[in-house]
């Protein structure tokens, strides 16, 4: 006890292995360096302006890459993080009230459940202390603009942000909407802090604005490799760019 281990850790050392969901085949082991994890924490803090006074409510399980990366923002800011085991609307609102949460990360079904519970009278907002809740962050799937319109009806002062991310590029943050762009609800956003984004055709050439192509991202959060799978790695990593396999287009 009290003796520091004789080990030197650098940003480029291996830090963690995450697993893909396996939707297109067997799950792949995704190897990330310490640099990836640290950068993801900085990105989260930068995007949402987290400070020591913020309280972040994390509802998804921590084995989910996005949940872990959002939570890391609290480590950078020195703020408090609350982990909630359960997704019932009344549990979420009670946690926000009792823990005085300022930032809450929701998935689309959970936000819909909260709104449905409000509109059915199942929950009464005046029972809870919610005035400190400043930011509703939602993601991990497409967000219907109609959902945010409903949400603003009951929470008109909330900031809103969404993002695009994937485990190979350390979860959320490589593309995010930004709280200043609520008028662009339905879009995934622009390049996140420290990230580059491009959209390419089948030959790898950057497409023009408005044209459809493959979304590619580049930044400190890109994985090192698929562990022990060079073939799969070489298919998606090109000159530092991660070819996501997702289709996108750039608007104005």
Feature annotation, model-predicted:
Residues 6-8, 185-191, 206, 236-240:
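Short Gly/Pro-enriched turn/cap motifs at secondary-structure boundaries
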Residues 2-19, 26, 49-55:
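Conserved pre-ATP/AMP-binding loop-to-beta segment of ANL
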Residues 205-210, 214-252:
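Conserved ATP-binding/catalytic segment of the ANL
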Residues 38-55, 63-103, 117-118, 124:
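Conserved AMP-binding/adenylation subdomain of ANL enzymes
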Residues 76, 101-106, 115-183, 196:
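Gly/Ser/Thr-rich phosphate-binding loop
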Residues 28-31, 58, 80-86, 161:
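Short beta-strand->loop structural element characteristic of the AMP-binding/adenylate-forming
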Residues 14, 20-23, 31, 56, ...:
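Conserved S/T- and glycine-rich ATP-binding loop of Class I adenylate-forming
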């Amino acid at each position: 006890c009290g003796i520091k281990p004789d080990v030197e850790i650098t940003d480029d050392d291996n830090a963690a292995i995450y697993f893909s969901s396996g939707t297109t085949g067997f799950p792949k082991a995704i190897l990330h360096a310490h640099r990836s994890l640290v950068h993801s924490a900085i990105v989260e803090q930068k995007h949402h302006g987290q400070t020591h006074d913020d309280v972040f409510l994390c509802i998804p399980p921590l084995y989910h890459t996005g949940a872990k990366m959002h939570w890391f923002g609290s480590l950078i800011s020195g703020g408090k993080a609350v982990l909630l085991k359960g997704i019932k609307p009344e549990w979420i609102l009670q946690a926000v009230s009792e823990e005085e949460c300022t930032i809450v990360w929701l998935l689309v079904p959970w936000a819909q459940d909260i709104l449905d519970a409000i509109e059915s009278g199942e929950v009464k907002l005046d029972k809870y202390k919610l005035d400190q809740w400043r930011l509703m962050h939602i993601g991990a799937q497409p967000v219907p603009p109609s959902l945010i319109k409903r949400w603003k009806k009951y929470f008109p002062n909330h900031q809103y942000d969404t993002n695009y991310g994937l485990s190979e590029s350390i979860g959320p943050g490589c593309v995010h909407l930004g709280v200043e762009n609520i008028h662009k609800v339905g879009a995934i956003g622009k390049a996140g802090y420290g990230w580059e984004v491009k959209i390419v055709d089948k030959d790898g050439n950057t497409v023009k604005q408005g044209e459809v192509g493959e979304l590619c991202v580049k930044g400190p959060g890109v994985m090192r490799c698929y562990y022990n799978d060079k073939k799969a790695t070489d298919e998606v990593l090109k000159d530092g760019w991660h070819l996501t396999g997702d289709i996108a287009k750039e608007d104005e």
